Amino acid sequence: GDKTAGFLFYQTQDGFQFRSIDDMIEQESVATYVYTEVNKSSVDRNNDFRIIKYSVDKNQDLLKKLRLGTYSSQQLFFNPLNFRFTTPEQGKFKFQKSDVKKLGAREIELPKISDEAERTLDDLPTRIFTGILDVGTLDRGISRNVNADASKYQAQSTMRYNVLLTQTISMLIPCNTDLRAGNVITCEFPKISREDSSELDPDISGKYIIKELCHHFDPEGSYTSMKIVRDSFGFYGG
């Protein structure tokens, strides 16, 4: 459908995978990892699901997303059959919150373009996509139909992929060869405060998709390092 642009082609130890981002987000979490500096027992199985260390690599790089046209863009395509261009109204693309499934519970809120303005950053295009439509070029016969109309997916797939990379975390955990790139995991990080508290940090805790991972084995121990990503903040999305 028109609302499902954004597919990923990648390889894991199980072979090649081709999946939509929405399908990956709707997966059940395969494991829950907790960051704690307490190591209760060397034989406690809970230590297998402990985050040894982590670092937040990216946390909403707004300027980069504006440069890539993530939230709003203008498309300009040329039809070589009738020598017409798409109109400004036809080529306008705007980020729609309701069309996007997300890992976090918090809505993506964009700032206003100025303190006095009512419009937000998704109301003004920040990138222009240009191209030539494929009309009868790659068809075996004679056709006047547009083949793989880029105006229906190019801007949306760019939006979907870049929104997915809103928050990126690198972390190290005890070795787990059952994990795969593309799996969803739940991560729990304690909220930093002066007082003793078991409260979780809502800004970085929640569900993530494993973007990449590798396993390391040596006589001192076995570890899995990974990079995880998600598109929004909060514990649970939908």
Language model: regions and residue ranges:
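An acidic/polar, Gly/Ser/Thr-rich interaction patch typically located in mid-to-C-terminal regions
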Residues: T36-G238
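Short beta-strand-centered interaction patches in the first periplasmic/extracellular domains
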Residues: G1-K64
